[in-house]
């Protein structure tokens, strides 16, 4: 990916604007970081959800079933986003830089998924911790409280990490997208120059025709 990005930076802007596949491979470190977070979310939420669902009993069946289902659905959401980005990149069906920047690894869609995951984990953890204060047998209360604190802590870490990530990447414009936009603006300037030159040439032809008519 880094080799493609370096090659892309050496291309002219008008040629670079047509190389859509290079837009997906820019900023490989950011893409690797977001992909690693997605893998951790899928593995952690999936394993936690399966563990809660498999340990469901009559005494603590309701909350384990609910939290396990939420964690499995959350892992499925993150996995579907990654698969969708890979499928769109392989099919090469998007030709706009804004859409590529949204769907690629490290783009806006990843930030939305991480934000939703952190919010769901935080709310679920706080809900479990609040329910653990209600009168109930000791063992389910202890398990519910520990799971709630763990989920709330993970959600807080995700939200804090996303905030630091957004602060760190704010103000940085993707170089390939910038060059693509400049290339498009360059094409627009050239077309305006051509139109002006065409108008000038037509005016010159009109003056030439009038001068010939006056001579005759």
Curated annotation (Swiss-Prot):
Location within or outside the cell: Membrane
Q: Which InterPro entries match?
A: TMEM125
Q: In which broad location class does this protein mainly occur, judging by the first location in its UniProt entry? A: membrane
Membrane topology summary: Multi-pass membrane protein
Q: Name one GO cellular component term.
A: membrane
Q: Does the keyword Membrane apply?
A: yes
Which named protein is this? Transmembrane protein 125
Q: Which organism is it from?
A: Mus musculus
Gene name, Swiss-Prot/TrEMBL: Tmem125
